[in-house]
């Protein structure tokens, strides 16, 4: 169906006037300005959802004209800019003109989130690196890109080593590199919106050690050379119904306000969009893969909230849910509001690990008292309520049905040797999209065939798209967003077609499986942190001298971020205790560079599990994810009786739930895939 012709601005404005009070914008130029932000946001999962920012109840004719205008705006050619190889030199020239000798470029925006909008992708624009975590430090005579173990291979593929030396962020952190490489008396610039106070403290110490000086810059120099930089994203902000949230925004605000009052704090600055979305029961779409409305908030001890975000994107339905206790302001009002708090001598809570240093500088300059502490929404958001947990279970049933059907299809299709990584990922997404409440993927699907599976966070592109081949391992890490929950699952599959896996493949896979089962079966006392459990997932690998260079588990939100804190399961020390209602991933792995990757991931929820000696409360895990685990890669001799019992019970549950939903051929495959070991 083609796009109708655009009848012109005057005709559009006439239709907007005819919409009466339903219209939120009345001039075509305002609609065009809005569309620049719409173009910078991820595409709507629900067709024409963006129109709610223009008009509440558009007629069919008005919808057609809005679509036509959007198509016309989308067809504009992008502004040409510098080639990737020219950007580093241009940045150095800009720094020299400003009297600055170096600059720190994090992969971050003012919200410190994992997914940042296109307008904030400075690290990718400058270096070519597209991973979800990293940082660059640029000096006059050298530059380095810092990534963690998930991205070392990817960085080598994407970044010119003649421009940036690639460093492992934990083995040689950016601050240490700067301490060694910064010339004496050098001025090192940074954007205070993009670094936290803790970041700044580390870099300041490094500069002192090097005899250099760290300086905040009023304007980011990357922005001054970035021609054609996208506009800030605009996606509609909508209410999340109480039947999904399980607790009203009013109750949440009152509960957290009481916590602030008990701590003798007047207000808390919230800079994490997922915290704001959870507190207000709102969802948006400003970034890929997470339903986040970008903005800031100020929560007062009386439970009232000032919400700072572009008012154009807050729909009429969202405003109605906010009510009189929430004041909506433009982002530009944040600074003056913080100034007022300072002038009144208020005590303000801010998180030095997640809030931009700009917030702290503004509050201190205004005279406010600052209490450094964790975002007050983090912990209550992580502990899902009964309604959220019920929704998450329901989402995993739909997700598991889609994935199980896909795995049956894959077993039939892949051995022919024609299926590619990209086509497989697209097939799975289409199956998920057919389910109820689907709102997009929760992260870009990792579809890694053969050696690509060894790249922990591999992202397939048209230039890297590889066929799935017989005799190879295929790693598929995927997830989705649903109105009632967020999923994240990894399955590792052997592409048979008459071939058999090697003994090494089976050994590696089974050791990963043993670690997965050990964590899933864990029973532990209240007060235990994830770092205390991490060894359970690694032990079988360690016994063979093997290891994986990533965490074992990350927190997962409820129709929010697929990666959330404050809890995690990792070798990195973490004092946050696991609590009932927390959802976390269980994903040990093994990666043989140039050959294959193995990872088995289910989401698990912390639950109460009776009492131990002395009446101490005990906890355990409920496995949420449901999909077959590859039997062809299991060396049964390596499993003990308890491990076999766990696997057989898990597969029996999968078969019972999904067998009736499959066609005859897929049902026969599932019977074999879930047979007892």
Predicted regions and their residues:
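Domain-length accessory/inserted modules outside core catalytic folds
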Residues: 1-78
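Active-site neighborhoods and metal-handling regions in enzymes and metal-associated proteins
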Residues: 79-677
